[in-house]
Amino acid sequence: MAKKVLIVEDDKFLRELISQKLLKEGYDIAETVDGEKGLETVKKEKPDLVLLDLILPGINGFDVLTKIKEDPSLAQIPVIILSNLGQKDDIERGLKLGAVDYLIKAHFTPGEIIAKVKSVIG
C-alpha cells in the first residue's frame, strides 16, 4: 500500500509541483491550503507524513504542529516543516515542537524535498 503524504501549503505552484513529484514516486497525496483544513485532514486521514508550511491562512503551521503533537492518536506522524521562515529562532521552535526536519524553501529543490520525505518514511 502506498504511503500517504499530506501537503499543507498555500502556494499553489509549489504545492502542485511537490504533489506531482511525490505521485511519480508512488506516494498517495492529500493537499490542503490552510492550517484548519490541514489539521482536519491529519485527523481524518492519518497520513504517514505531513509537509507543513508555517505561514498559512487561519491558524499557522506552528499551531498545527503543536496540535498534532499534543494529540496521542497523531503524535507519531512525522512532520517536515517547509517554510520561507529561515531565522534561527523559527527553526529551533519548529524542531522543539516536534518537527523531524525544517526545510527552508529557498534552500531546497523539489527533488531534495522528495529525498527528505523518502529518508523519513521510505
Residue ranges of model-derived segments:
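Active-site residues of response regulator receiver
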Residues: D53, S83
